[in-house]
Amino acid sequence: MLTILTLKILLMIVYLSHWDWNLYKSRKDIVLNLDELNIKSICPEGIYTKELKTIYQEHINWKIDREKTFDLKGVINLKNILNSLEGGTIVHSFTLKTGILYSVANLFVNNRIKGVLSINGLGYLFSNNFKAKLLKLLLKTFIKKSFNKSFKEIIFQNESDKEIFLKFSGYSGRISLIKGSGIELNNYIKKETYQTEKLKVIFVSRLLIDKGVNNYIELTKNILDSNIDFYLAGEIDDGNPNSITQKDLEKIKNLDNVKYIGSINVEKELFNYDISIIMSKYEGFSRILLESLYIGLFCISNNIPGTRWLKEFNNGFLVENNNLNSISKVINNFKEYGFSKADAESNREIIKKKYSTKIISNQYNEIYNNLASS
């Protein structure tokens, strides 16, 4: 029988995504905390390729066009990459789109690899967009037939996504619930001073319609108080059909009621703000909400399955259906909420015990070791 030590020596893990951002921004800390050091990345080359090469043992360029709904050449390239892997390799796909592309390529893979899929929110495919609904209908039969063969285990971030997807897909393999990707606690500058006047409100997100960027712009028009400043941080996602356009962004830049500040270093800069707004319509487990809580901001979030856990904490307020009047009322009457440094410290203790990168990485380790021994 193989010992745990032997398993770790033999174990090869590959992280797969159709976007380099996924394997850097949300996974780099997990990789650095895993017991197994033999981890490769497969994703298209992009602005984070240089960083990926310093974190993963090897980076393999997946030649795929993110802007296409289905890139046949990209699937063929992935098939060739998968066939080059050693038998027994664990291929961990991140996002539902990547999982679908992997399942297509896997139909033509000859070696015995073990698939794992992390569904970090159901995303575009399960949105109310007409094209998305049509695409979901077309893919339903394929997903039902292929996912049980392609994936030994599927990881969800909340119960609602799990129930919806299992009903849709008929998946019958192993299932795990891991809440988020965790945060590396020592990387963050904590907020030390708290104020109730001259507030700085910030919305940090990819600039997607479903993330609520247009709702946020409407909110800034609702509150005309010289003591409240609004900031928008994030970038257009050209490979996402739900992204705002460059023309939309130029209009935002010309607005007087909100300041667009581009991409920010959340770990080092977010402490400068007072209130974090999350207006997403769909979310697996909101990372920016977790980061905002740990840093010490007051958080106002749309009440969806991926943010509902905010109820555990002191410094948060959930609103229904992004109700602008409810959000405006909280901001305008912020003094009444009495949020303090002591509340922030209490929240940090919860995060240390439940949501740190180390906690999440241990759950990943358990999954990989179980797969290696099966």
Language-model features: locations:
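A conserved mid-protein helix/loop that constitutes part of the nucleotide-sugar donor-binding site
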Residues: 24-29, 203, 208-222, 290
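Glycosyltransferase donor-sugar binding loop
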Residues: 42-48, 183, 204, 229-246
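Donor nucleotide-sugar binding/catalytic pocket of nucleotide-sugar-dependent glycosyltransferases
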Residues: 60-61, 144, 148-189
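Short His-centered aromatic/hydrophobic patch
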Residues: 93-99, 119-120
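Nucleotide-activated donor-binding/catalytic signature segment of Leloir-type glycosyltransferases, i.e.
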Residues: 244-263
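Aromatic "clamp/platform" in nucleotide-sugar-dependent glycosyltransferases that forms part
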Residues: 281
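Short hydrophobic beta-strand element within catalytic cores of glycosyltransferases
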Residues: 298-301
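Conserved acidic donor-binding segment of nucleotide-sugar-dependent glycosyltransferases
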Residues: 313, 317-325, 333-338
